């Protein structure tokens, strides 16, 4: 019966492998099945720790609330309660907006919510449920240095992070009498950038793994 659900599964191959492993385990056979482990909103967890944000920490399991929290569902439900069922947003879409916005993205939230009332409800909700973590987003934008070729920092284990600032140069070239635009990435200062938040968070993630 379970195998009949494979076409409906979000990840059909993983679902199929899991069912096979389940059947073999029930027969007492060694399965050697590699399980998948994932953190609970690891980006939000790290931001909560960096900022000492108790509200955000309770949202994603950093502070034990007595049961397993699902930050994405909590934020989604907060939005639905605020704007009503007419919002026509899904948890999965909301999750995409939350994940990317915590790394500085504004494009994905706009794709999900548009640029009107729904987007503002999203911003207000994030500010309410994870105030310090959300504010750190703006800090990462504000500390962008428009004069440097790289951003550098040192982690507690003396790992030196060096991230080049990359921009693009567009040039027109002729090839067989046809004009083409060639885009080249170069190491050059940029007036604005959104990568600091993601890079700092990921560097701390790597530090914890080491």
List the model feature ranges, each with a label.
Residues 1-210:
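Conserved catalytic core of nucleotide polymerization and phosphodiester-bond processing enzymes
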């Amino acid at each position: 019966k379970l195998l009949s659900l494979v076409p409906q599964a979000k990840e059909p191959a993983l679902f199929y492998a899991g069912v096979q492993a389940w059947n073999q385990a029930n027969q007492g056979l060694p399965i050697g099945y590699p399980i998948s482990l994932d953190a609970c909103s690891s980006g939000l967890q790290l931001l909560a720790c960096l900022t000492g944000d108790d509200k955000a920490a309770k949202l994603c399991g950093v502070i034990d609330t007595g049961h397993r929290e699902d930050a994405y569902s909590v934020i989604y439900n907060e939005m639905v309660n605020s704007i009503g069922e007419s919002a026509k947003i899904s948890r999965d879409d909301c999750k995409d907006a939350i994940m990317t916005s915590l790394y500085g993205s504004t494009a994905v939230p706009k794709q999900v919510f548009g640029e009107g009332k729904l987007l503002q409800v999203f911003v207000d909700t994030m500010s309410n449920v994870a105030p310090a973590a959300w504010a750190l987003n703006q800090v990462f934008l504000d500390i962008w240095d428009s004069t440097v070729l790289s951003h550098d920092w040192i982690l507690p284990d003396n790992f030196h992070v060096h991230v080049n600032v990359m921009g693009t140069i567009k040039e027109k070239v002729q090839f067989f009498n046809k004009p083409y635009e060639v885009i080249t990435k170069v190491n050059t200062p940029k007036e604005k950038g959104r990568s600091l938040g993601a890079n700092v968070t990921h560097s701390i993630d790597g530090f914890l793994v080491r």
